Amino acid sequence: MSGTRDGDLNAAIRTALGKVIDPELRRPITELGMVKSIDTGPDGSVHVEIYLTIAGCPKKSEITERVTRAVADVPGTSAVRVSLDVMSDEQRTELRKQLRGDTREPVIPFAQPDSLTRVYAVASGKGGVGKSTVTVNLAAAMAVRGLSIGVLDADIHGHSIPRMMGTTDRPTQVESMILPPIAHQVKVISIAQFTQGNTPVVWRGPMLHRALQQFLADVYWGDLDVLLLDLPPGTGDVAISVAQLIPNAELLVVTTPQLAAAEVAERAGSIALQTRQRIVGVVENMSGLTLPDGTTMQVFGEGGGRLVAERLSRAVGADVPLLGQIPLDPALVAAGDSGVPLVLSSPDSAIGKELHSIADGLSTRRRGLAGMSLGLDPTRR
C-alpha cells in the first residue's frame, strides 16, 4: 500500500511540475526533460532534482522557487527540497533538436512561408525622434494583451533597448542556440548584451548584416505573435538587410511634427518602394506639450505625421494611415530611463492611452496570405 501511495504522490508531483514553465524557454520543464528525479519520504517530504541548461543559468533561483511552490501545493507533501544539476552535452544537443529541429544550418523562422509572426520594422529618418521609445512601449502594451512578443535591437551602433526595458541579463547559450532574456514579458535581444559596459560597436556593413542574421536565426524566439525590430535611423545597411532577410517585414515609420524631420522620415519610408515592403503606418511622436492651463504648446510645430502619411500613401499607391499622435511629456523620458515602459507605469495617462491604442491596432491585424503556403494542390480534385 505504501508503494501505491508513493506512486500516486510521485505522479501528482510530476503533474504539478508539468505546469512549471521555464522562464527562458517558455515551455513546461517536464516537456524539456529538466526533471531529473523525484523522491518522496514516508512523512511526505519531497526531494526534486532539476537539470539546468548551463551551469551559470541566470534563472536558477526563479526555477527553484517555481518548482518549490508547485510541489508544496500538492496535497500530501510536507518539506520540499530542490537540488540543481546541469545537462550533459548530449542532453543539450537533444534539447536543441527538440526546439529547433535537427537542422545543420539555422534558418530564419520569420522568413518561412508558413510563419504567422507579424514582423514590424520600426524606422525613422532622423535620430532622436523617439523611435526606440515607441518600440518598447508598443512591445510592452502588446505583451499586456497576452501576446508573445519579441524585440530585436537592430540599431547596433546606437543600441538602447535593454536600458529602456530595464534588463541587464545576458543571453543563455545552449550549443549554437541563444536564449534571449525576458523583460516585462517581452523577449529582448541586443548587441549590448554581448559587450562590456558602454563599449562602442565599430562595425561596417557586412558585420552588421551578419549580426542581424544571427539575431534572427540563432536566437530561439519560440512562437511569437509579433516581432518588433528597432532599426537605426535612415536608409542604410541594416534597413536593406532587414528587407533581404525578412521580405515580409512591414515598416512602421516614426516622426515628429517638425517638417524637417518629416521630410527625412518620408525618405526612410520610401525605401519600401525599392524593397517591396508594406508600410503599415506612421506614428507622430512629441506631438504637443500640454500646459498647466490645459492649452497645448506645439514645441516642434505640427502636421509632420499627417504629411508623411499622405505623401507615403501617394508614393506607394495605398493607404498609409497616421496611427497615432503621442504627446510630448517628460514622463515618457523618465519611464524610458527607469526601464519601465510608460504603458505599464502610467497606462491611463494620455500618452499611455494613445500608445495602447496604437498597439491595439497593430495587434489585431492579421498577416496576409501573400507568400504563404495554403497546403492546396490544384491538380487534385
Swiss-Prot record:
What's this protein's family per the entry?
A: In the N-terminal section; belongs to the MIP18 family. In the C-terminal section; belongs to the Mrp/NBP35 ATP-binding proteins family.
- Annotated PROSITE patterns: MRP
Recorded superkingdom? Bacteria
Q: How does it assemble?
A: Homodimer.
Listed binding positions for ATP are G125, K126, G127, G128, V129, G130, K131, S132
What does the UniProt record say this protein does?
A: Binds and transfers iron-sulfur (Fe-S) clusters to target apoproteins. Can hydrolyze ATP.
What Gene3D superfamilies does this protein map onto? Fe-S cluster assembly (FSCA), P-loop containing nucleotide triphosphate hydrolases
Set out the biological process GO terms recorded for this chain's protein.
iron-sulfur cluster assembly
Additional detail: Was identified as a high-confidence drug target.
Q: What is this protein called?
A: Iron-sulfur cluster carrier protein
Q: Which UniProt keywords apply?
A: ATP-binding, Hydrolase, Iron, Iron-sulfur, Metal-binding, Nucleotide-binding
Q: Which InterPro entries match?
A: FSCA_dom_sf, MIP18-like, Mrp-like_CS, Mrp/NBP35_ATP-bd, NUBPL-like, P-loop_NTPase, YlxH/NBP35
Pfam families assigned to the protein according to its UniProt record, in alphabetical order: FeS_assembly_P, ParA
One GO molecular function term? metal ion binding
Disulphide bond pairs? none
